[in-house]
């Protein structure tokens, strides 16, 4: 579980909501600190601290790209924070003290943020609201990772190339088995075949074997398996996306971003959205 800043800054929704939450939290704690503590509700302090823990937790989950695994847990935790902030805002908004009013304003902003988080994290990935929000991060990620480079395409061509050679070798063995016995009179002219020619032939054979081994080593290795949580239809405008059905098992790798490299059981290779699958190994 690696912490990568790119996971966080690559999601505009994460940046916007966490930044808004930190600003609202600073307003709330500044108002609480400037209020006379003799008449300030003690439980509001716990609500402010609890809200900070929620913001830090969400930031950490985005940094580790595990936010999708704890969405339902977050909904419960944020619902508790929503009760805290709305209760504090209701108790402070009618006060005449400027510090309490400042804290009430911060709690109102935090309540708005908590409500947005509950709707987003509690919503289905295919719901209109979630798809609208995710579209911003998906577009930016597709632009960076959606197109394969010419070198990667060239490597794929090289990995496919050795297949005809194996087919030719098989045909050569069959033709050798069917070749009739040759007498010594038919072998005239082969006495000039030198050992240098033999060494050259061996060098060419070894070179071909090394090329095949190198191509096999360059082939992508899928270290993880994931189960599809929902069915997904690939974007026809992006040739690198793959379609899959719910509960289908995929081989995945490169799981740091919002799009993972995946391979279906049919051998089809492409990219899939990380919020549609769940790691099982």
From Swiss-Prot:
One term under GO cellular component: plasma membrane
Bilayer topology term: Multi-pass membrane protein
Transmembrane helix keyword on record: yes
Cytoplasmic face residues: 1-12, 64-73, 122-281
Pfam families xrefs: SH3_1
InterPro entries: SH3-like_dom_sf, SH3_domain, Sho1_SH3
Extracellular side: 34-42, 95-100
Subcellular location: Cell membrane
SH3 domain mapped to chain residues: 221-281
Sequence ranges of Polar residues compositional bias: 168-183
GO biological process annotation, one example: regulation of actin filament polymerization
PROSITE patterns: SH3
UniProt keyword terms in alphabetical order: Cell membrane, Membrane, SH3 domain, Stress response, Transmembrane, Transmembrane helix
TM helices/strands, residue ranges: 13-33, 43-63, 74-94, 101-121
Segments of this protein annotated with the region Disordered: 164-183
Lineage top rank: taxon: Eukaryota
UniProt similarity note: Belongs to the SHO1 family.
Purpose of the protein: Plasma membrane osmosensor that activates the high osmolarity glycerol (HOG) MAPK signaling pathway in response to high osmolarity.
Subunit structure: Forms homooligomers.
This protein's name: High osmolarity signaling protein SHO1
Biological source species: Meyerozyma guilliermondii (strain ATCC 6260 / CBS 566 / DSM 6381 / JCM 1539 / NBRC 10279 / NRRL Y-324) (Yeast)
